Regions:
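Non-heme di-metal
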Residues: 1-172
Length: 172
């Protein structure tokens, strides 16, 4: 008998050998099921791919816009609206992640199905993003654009922190 839910022991099946999960998320489903499938027309393949990409890009845009709207709401004294925008942004980010998972390497050839490969790739990307944002901040400062300089320079520091954090994880 289960001590938590009180279900009788007769309802349980002893698991022997390697356990199999009934359902798992998979990486690169588009490539596995659509891309080279002779039963799907080229027109439908293009439609499916284009829609997966458009949805990924749309979800990513919504994340940025919703977080921007959250910042506006907080500044205007509407913290509950700001918090809702933040929640919605997180859900949109989850949607983007699922589209990225479906698309796999067809979205980004450097993105792989392994954590180690993704860490190595993103370390390089974060270091590059740090430099790119720093260069933009310097240009903005040179032109007296303090708001752009200050914001982007802070982002460059964030990218540097991300790069070091990912690098530390990769070295473990």
């Amino acid at each position: 008998r289960c001590p938590v839910c009180r279900v009788p022991a007769s309802k349980f099946v002893e698991q022997k050998g390697e356990q199999k999960l009934a359902a798992v998320h998979e990486y690169g489903v588009y490539a596995q099921t659509v891309k080279n499938n002779p039963d799907i027309s080229d027109e439908d393949k293009k439609f499916i791919f284009d829609q997966l990409m458009a949805n990924f890009n749309g979800e990513c845009s919504e994340v940025g816009m919703y977080l921007c709207m959250a910042r506006i709401a907080h500044r205007e004294g509407y913290p509950e609206i700001g918090l809702y925008w933040e929640k919605a942004a997180y859900e949109e980010a989850e949607h983007a992640a699922k589209f990225a998972e479906l698309l796999g390497e067809d979205l980004e050839p450097n993105m792989k199905a392994t954590t180690k490969d993704n860490l190595a790739w993103r370390v390089d990307c974060e270091f590059g993003a740090t430099q790119g944002k720093f260069d933009l901040a310097v240009c903005a400062k040179k032109n007296g654009l303090d708001a752009i300089h200050d914001t982007v320079h802070e982002m460059a520091r964030d990218e540097a922190r991300h790069g070091r954090g990912l690098e530390g994880l990769l070295k473990r």
